[in-house]
Amino acid sequence: MYNVKKDFPIFKNQGDPYVYLDSAATTHKPQCVIDSIVDYYSSSYATVNRALYTASHDITFAHWQVRSKVGSWIGAQYDQEIIFTRGTTSSLNLLAIAANDSWLAGGTVVISEAEHHANLVSWELACQRSGATIKKVRVDDEGMVDCSHLEQLLKQGVQLVSLAHVSNVSGAVLPLPEIAHLVHRYEALFAVDGAQGVGKGPLNLSEWGVDFYAFSGHKLYAPTGIGVLYGKKELLESLPPVEGGGDMVIVYDFEELSYQEPPLRFEAGTPHIAGVLGLGAAIDYLQALPFSITDRLTELTHFLYEQLLTVPGIQIIGPKQGAARGSLCSISIPGVQASDLGFLLDGRGISVRSGHQCSQPAMVRWDLGHVLRASLGIYNEQQDILLFVEALKDILRAYRS
């Protein structure tokens, strides 16, 4: 079996054991991504889109090539559908502000009752400014959107539906093609928070009918501070810019102001060039791996779920075994604080997430205070899961004695 960990220097440089089970928060970086950033700053540094000298020309070409790589990974039709942002949160806010300045005013946005704050608060702020209304669609006990309830809301008149591809709490994976078809039947638009979906394998957004898709590079083994907003070309062309600055205008002379076509219309100022190049290197790395990322993560997630079933007295949030689940499991243990468990596990070299996962409405939906979440990346192995579960059992035995 291919040894993925050898490609990630963090696993050589941390102590032993180092069991990292927090890839839903952020993924580690392979050496090739780190090298791409160092090479840019040390050997090929220049700005993009602004100069004719050779170094700038070369890096501008490399920078644009990453749009093609991203488009290939997510299934876009055109390079122009790829807007570089700071991350998922930045992408969703960009979309919400642009929509607020165009077709959202006085309308209705639908989100689920279990969204991440990035998807909740961005639309809440936009609706406060525009006078639009937010309505929430129910999710079932496993975290799946209630499509019957969604259709009821759509019948009342909705401009946009914004949902997470994969829940960062329950791990529920939404059937994007089916939901897109339903949303479009009622002439609404469909936006997706793809933070937890983009790293599970290549996507096919144009075929699925998704109108907008937001994600972060740092959850795709790329650097922090770089993200993407995908939007259908004709929809992006209909939206106004949300920031002004260099490279997003064609003409400005105090009397005339004209904007670039997307994506440059939405990329004012000097971009995060190193981050973009790192994102491209991450996609190159993932596409060259000698195995299916989707299959590997699915198998590991099933193994994690099965092992957690052997822990007495815990509740596993989200889909049952065999159903579609992102590469994470959140658990709740009555009478035991998740933060205590996270602290004690850290003392044994095991990194997991404890808290409300930046999704307080999800905690309300499942009547939880906090959860402990273990999430997987391509570098994880069954041994990581066994060490985590055995440590969890040992801590709980001591906790209950």
Curated annotation (Swiss-Prot):
Substrates-to-products reaction catalysed: (sulfur carrier)-H + L-cysteine = (sulfur carrier)-SH + L-alanine
Record-listed E.C. numbers: 2.8.1.7
Biological process (GO), any one: cysteine metabolic process
SUPFAM superfamilies tied to this protein: PLP-dependent transferases
Keyword Transferase: yes
Alphabetized CDD domains for the sequence: SufS_like (cd06453)
Active-site residues annotated for this sequence: C358
Pfam families per record: Aminotran_5
Keyword Cell cycle: no
GO MF assignments: cysteine desulfurase activity; pyridoxal phosphate binding
Cofactor dependence: pyridoxal 5'-phosphate
Residues bearing PTM N6-(pyridoxal phosphate)lysine: K219
UniProt entry keywords in alphabetical sequence: Pyridoxal phosphate, Transferase
Superkingdom of origin organism: Bacteria
InterPro entries: Aminotrans_V_dom, Aminotrans_V_PyrdxlP_BS, Cys_dSase_SufS, Cysteine_dSase, PyrdxlP-dep_Trfase, PyrdxlP-dep_Trfase_major, PyrdxlP-dep_Trfase_small
Physiological role: Catalyzes the removal of elemental sulfur and selenium atoms from L-cysteine, L-cystine, L-selenocysteine, and L-selenocystine to produce L-alanine.
Family to which the UniProt record says this protein belongs: Belongs to the class-V pyridoxal-phosphate-dependent aminotransferase family. Csd subfamily.
NCBIfam families for this protein: sufS
Record-given protein name: Probable cysteine desulfurase
Organism: Chlamydia trachomatis serovar D (strain ATCC VR-885 / DSM 19411 / UW-3/Cx)
Phylogenetic placement of the source organism: Bacteria, Pseudomonadati, Chlamydiota, Chlamydiia, Chlamydiales
